[in-house]
Amino acid sequence: MDLFFRKYGSGPPLIIVHGLYGSSDNWVTIGKALGRRFEVFIPDQRNHGRSQHSDHHSYELMRDDLLEFMDKHSIGKPILLGHSMGGKTIMFFATSFPERVNGLIVVDIAPKSYFSYSGESVQAADHLFIIRAMENLDLSKIRNRDEADREMSSRIKSGRVRQFLLKNLSRSKNGTFHWKLNIEVIRKDLVRILEGLNASEFERGNQITGFPVLFIRGANSTYILDSDIPFIQKIFPYAEVTTIPDAGHWLHAEQPEMLIEKVVRFVFGE
């Protein structure tokens, strides 16, 4: 699949992979800042941003999209940074093609599954709520983004989250709005998006040890709990886990300078 991407700077290659509902647009500020030290590539994943839509959405497909992207742009062995769904994408990639990875930076996501048939998963419930809120927005009646924001405010109270989601709105030539995000497929394949890696595949010496690994979590986020660290280290036994204070799941928007600092320190030891 041909992925739209943005590129900044020069230096060792770094690929930033965005999360669910996101796009390269959310990472421009961080991409430009990291471009002072890296050659930064930020692709839009399938069914997101300006990349192509597909009838299917899974980590195996996104992993293969990333491999195709790297081969197309002659990126041999980059550092991979992924947030949320993008973090899962790069974990699936790194465990499948470890020889193509120079370092792994996973932002606020664990390798576990976040799906629960019992309905106990806060994250699964949150995603279903967000998808329904987007689907219930009557775009035929929306004249501008402020109206869309007001309509969504009755369902989604956080202004920050609404603005993040509304970055997916695009105006057609006839003046009507549409979602850049392929909401129908995201809803259909949400269970697959919430799935995790199988830790049993990495027993008996199959763990990933050939490159440094950093997990960065937000102090106010519930995506990486202390109880998840043993699971992380079953797959990545030498992984470091660090926490950014005063940040939730979207820590790249809440604490961008701290995130940049941790990335630079991890790669260059500064």
Indicate where each model-derived feature is located.
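Conserved HGGG/HGGXW glycine-rich cap/lid loop of the alpha/beta-hydrolase fold
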Residues: 4-53
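Structural signature of beta-strand start/N-cap positions in the alpha/beta core
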Residues: 13, 39, 74-79, 100-103, ...
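Active-site loop/oxyanion-hole signature of alpha/beta-hydrolase fold enzymes
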Residues: 32-35, 41-85, 89, 95, ...
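Short beta-to-alpha linker loops that shape the active-site pocket of alpha/beta-hydrolase fold enzymes
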Residues: 44-49, 110, 247-248
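Flexible "cap/lid" loop of the alpha/beta hydrolase fold
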Residues: 95, 102-145
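Conserved serine/cysteine hydrolase catalytic core
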Residues: 173-235, 240-243
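Catalytic active-site module of serine/aspartate enzymes centered on a nucleophile-bearing elbow/loop
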Residues: 238-270
